[in-house]
UniProtKB/Swiss-Prot annotation:
Region (Involved in Mg(2+) ion dislocation from EF-Tu): 80-83
Subcellular location: Cytoplasm
GO molecular function, one term: translation elongation factor activity
Name of this chain's protein: Elongation factor Ts
Protein's gene: tsf
Native source organism of the sequence: Pectobacterium atrosepticum (strain SCRI 1043 / ATCC BAA-672) (Erwinia carotovora subsp. atroseptica)
HAMAP family: EF_Ts (MF_00050)
């Protein structure tokens, strides 16, 4: 009988996101063969969707697809990078994406209802919680998409641009994370909040209020440029702004969408040493 070490249990947990006792049991049954343990766990129907529903699904994939003048971006979550690369999970995400494009579905609850049966079956097969998290779409004269691996996806809609330019703009959005298209699009609420922050910083430096306010006015112009697409230095040629690039091509960006896997989801960090200690007390 092979020794089932804590490090072996930890590795299996990291690769499958299964519970510690479940991993230990699988390794015992597989006589310490981690690959066989994974295979047996994936074949087992004991891992049910109901048991995984409360687990945080913060990994996964971003998918994009363009169909003529219509494009969709989708996020489907799982719990680990291991499952995010699984063929069955990828096929499920692709199927959801195709349905969203074909039906022009932008209500994620509609997609969830349509694919709930398949989702539950996949959870039981793979052993992780899976969630169709969000979907959005763009329509435009010229559309471009870019995917940085499977974790970041971007759609860009433009006028007067060719496909190559829109592709480069999508790559820029992926890298530089703008929040708005143009400086004038930055909401009054965002501007007011940043103004107060910058004014407080300026006042703390000992400047009189009148001088501090003038300093902040200059900083605010810089701020709105930094958070807007057209105000940012173009990643492929930082000597010019995206706005200048568009002007050179007599083009305009009407909208963009950027998704990154797990944005806004708080991952639960597990203290492995504490969990080992707890498990040893139970045995």
């Amino acid at each position: 009988m092979a020794e089932i070490t804590a490090s072996l249990v930890k590795e299996l947990r990291e690769r499958t996101a299964a519970g510690m006792m479940e991993c230990k049991k699988a390794l015992v049954e597989a006589n310490g063969d981690i690959e066989l343990a994974i295979e047996n766990m994936r074949k087992s129907g004991a891992i049910k969707a109901a048991k995984k529903a409360g687990n945080v699904a913060a990994d996964g994939v971003i998918k994009t697809k363009i169909d003529g003048n219509y494009a969709v971006i989708l996020e489907v979550n799982c719990q680990t990078d291991f499952v995010a690369k699984d063929g069955g999970f990828q096929a499920f995400a692709d199927k959801v994406l195709d349905a969203a494009v074909a039906g022009k579905i932008t209500d994620v609850d509609v997609l969830k209802a349509q694919f709930e049966e398949e989702r539950v079956a996949l959870v039981a097969k793979i052993g992780e919680n899976i969630n169709i998290r969000r979907v959005s779409a763009l329509e435009g004269e010229v559309l471009g998409n870019y995917q940085h691996g499977a974790r970041i996806g971007v759609l860009v809609a433009a006028k007067g641009a060719d496909e190559e330019l829109v592709k480069h703009l999508a790559m820029h959005v992926a890298a530089s994370k703008p929040e708005f298209v143009k400086p004038e699009d930055v909401s009054a609420e965002v501007v007011a909040k940043e103004y107060q922050v910058q004014l407080e910083i300026a006042m703390q430096s000992g400047k009189p209020k009148e001088i501090a306010e003038k300093m902040v006015e200059g900083r605010m112009k810089k701020f709105t440029g930094e958070v807007s697409l057209t105000g940012q230095p173009f990643v492929m040629d930082p000597a010019k702004s995206v706005g200048q690039l568009l002007k050179e091509h007599n083009a305009d960006v009407t909208n963009f969408i950027r998704f990154e896997v797990g944005e806004g989801i708080e991952k639960v960090e597990t203290d492995f040493a504490a969990e080992v200690a707890a498990m040893s007390k139970q045995s």
